[in-house]
């Protein structure tokens, strides 16, 4: 059953325009094209709301209806999405993803710290029967492995580089929460809070207006893809930097939580 639609508000229209503008090409050749997806944008149409804005609709309207995404990101995860320009390339890319031949690296800003500077989380992931749409660590579940390393650490917060070795739903988010360092802004597997300046700055003075977070969205970014090009086998590494909110958060953490 499709959710009833209502005329979009002015705020909704502004947000839609912002998301559309934020989609950008990171790499392109004759066979494939990579986009930088902003946080808050679905990859594909919502099954309950077909009119909801999604990345593939933006791509089909702004670039070509013949492009196909070879993998997915969560709505609130920003970063690289690799698309094929032909069915043959799509088949080849999907095969590479299924074989684990495409190395995916993510940047995550978390609350707390993992147990080690670098490590491997091995924990089976299963749908959470108490919270539909969420996952949790449990058995029998599916095998899931995530490699991580500390990029930078502050009092109470850590920047991690993560590499999922399997491709389970919400895998990085579940695994980081499991080892005690949920991602900032994660309402499913953490407390949903972003980074507030008042948390890290001593004698912070609250103004008349409500404080806005330095980073208020899910602080998880798909920053690189490494693979062999399906057309000629040449080594490929496509990268894109995190959103500006990451840089802002790091700047204030360096200043007040170093």
Tell me the role of every PLM-derived stretch.
Residues 79-80, 234-236:
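Short active-site oxyanion
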Residues 1-145, 152-154, 176, 241-257:
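RNA pseudouridine synthases
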């Amino acid at each position: 059953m499709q959710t009833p639609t209502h005329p979009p508000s002015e705020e909704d229209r502004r947000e839609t325009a912002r998301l559309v503008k934020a989609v950008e090409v990171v790499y392109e050749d004759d066979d494939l094209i990579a986009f930088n997806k902003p946080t808050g944008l679905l990859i594909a149409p919502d099954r309950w709301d077909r009119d909801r804005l999604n990345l593939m609709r933006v791509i089909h309207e702004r670039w070509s209806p013949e492009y196909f995404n070879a993998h997915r990101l969560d709505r609130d995860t920003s970063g690289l999405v690799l698309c094929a320009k032909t069915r043959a390339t799509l088949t080849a890319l999907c095969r590479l993803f299924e074989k684990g031949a495409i190395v995916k690296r993510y940047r995550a800003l978390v609350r707390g710290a993992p147990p080690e500077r670098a490590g491997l989380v091995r924990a089976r992931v299963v749908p959470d029967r108490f919270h539909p749409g969420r996952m949790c660590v449990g058995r029998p579940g599916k095998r899931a492995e995530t490699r991580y390393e500390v990029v930078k650490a502050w009092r109470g917060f850590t920047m991690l580089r993560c590499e999922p070795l399997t491709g389970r739903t919400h895998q990085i988010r579940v695994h980081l929460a499991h080892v005690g360092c949920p991602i900032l802004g994660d309402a499913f597997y953490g407390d949903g809070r972003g980074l507030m300046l008042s948390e890290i700055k001593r004698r912070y003075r609250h103004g008349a207006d409500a404080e806005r977070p330095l980073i208020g969205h899910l602080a998880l970014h798909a920053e690189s893809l490494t693979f062999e090009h399906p057309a000629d086998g040449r080594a490929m590494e496509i990268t894109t930097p995190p959103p500006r909110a990451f840089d802002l958060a790091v700047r204030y953490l360096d200043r007040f939580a170093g």
